[in-house]
């Protein structure tokens, strides 16, 4: 994935007209302030920004996009958004019942479900060890690593897997490198860039043959104090679903990478997700992707 093709400059706000003509100056436009999380600037993040941009262009209302330039951890950003404090009024994250209770979810899975398809980063010297693993029972003898405030931590533990946690994204790779944990589950949307950034320096590899899978969704979440913003963006998202521009953008991100990861050749270990809200629109098949189709 080429992040340069999707990058929106973080140096200044982007003023986006709606799909219909918007009168007035930028000063009259409503503002959408989104976070820049430290240490995780990747092309999936920029893809999410591009989806947000498309939704604004098609919602029929004028908005100004403004990045919050200081690093803000995910847990802190969610607390600020829920309380109506701080500069944010939107963020994107994996869903959970707790997050849908505290925030306004836009139930439009930005990841098309693929955030729950996880490959394993391991130490390069231990690839053969993981090549012998064919069951969850065998995997339970080892320890995964995740951020302390990621929903994935609870999901993995609910399936009987051991999880060590860290409070710094970069430190997770160091924990794996130095043997404090055994593997780092990363989504198929993230793992190629993780390898490009940390693989050589931390002596890591992608474990052969395995793929963990659990149902989940990665949404935009809006401040509960801004229901009008949630309504406007939901309309824009439905329009880019209908006109095909959203899936085209998604495939631009994923198709080449999916083929390289050989997803269709991997053994799938299915996990349950006790955090998945009942309102998740699993019945809307047009919102979801099957990884095996991406390399076609």
Write out the residue ranges for each language-model feature:
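Extracytoplasmic small-molecule ligand-binding "clamshell" domains
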Residues: 25-100, 233
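Periplasmic-binding protein-like
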Residues: 36, 114-119, 196-234, 256-278
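Acidic, polar ligand-binding/catalytic clefts
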Residues: 70-138
């Amino acid at each position: 994935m080429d992040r340069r093709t999707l990058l929106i400059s973080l140096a200044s706000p982007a003023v986006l007209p709606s799909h219909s003509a918007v009168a007035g100056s930028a000063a009259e436009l409503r503002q959408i302030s989104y976070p820049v999380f430290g240490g995780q600037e990747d092309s999936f993040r920029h893809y999410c920004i591009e989806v947000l941009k498309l939704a604004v262009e098609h919602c029929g209302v004028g908005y100004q996009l403004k990045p919050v330039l200081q690093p803000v951890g995910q847990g802190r950003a969610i607390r600020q958004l829920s309380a109506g404090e701080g500069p944010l009024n939107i963020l994107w994250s994996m869903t959970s019942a707790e997050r849908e209770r505290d925030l306004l979810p836009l139930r439009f899975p930005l990841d098309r479900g693929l955030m729950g398809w996880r490959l394993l980063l391991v130490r390069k010297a231990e690839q053969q060890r993981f090549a012998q693993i064919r069951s969850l029972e065998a995997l339970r003898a080892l320890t995964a690593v995740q951020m302390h405030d990621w929903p994935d931590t609870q999901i993995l533990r609910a399936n009987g897997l051991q999880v060590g946690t860290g409070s710094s994204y970069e430190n997770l790779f160091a924990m794996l490198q130095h043997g404090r944990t055994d593997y780092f589950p990363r989504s198929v949307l993230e793992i190629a860039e993780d390898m490009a950034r940390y693989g050589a320096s931390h002596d890591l590899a992608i474990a052969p043959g395995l793929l963990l899978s659990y149902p989940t969704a990665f949404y935009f979440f809006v401040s509960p104090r801004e229901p009008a913003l949630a309504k406007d963006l939901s309309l824009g998202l439905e329009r880019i679903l209908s006109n095909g521009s959203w899936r085209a953008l998604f495939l631009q991100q994923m198709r080449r990478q999916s083929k390289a990861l050989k997803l269709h050749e991997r053994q799938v270990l299915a996990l349950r997700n006790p955090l998945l809200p009942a309102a998740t629109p699993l019945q809307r098949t047009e919102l979801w992707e099957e990884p095996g189709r991406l390399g076609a």
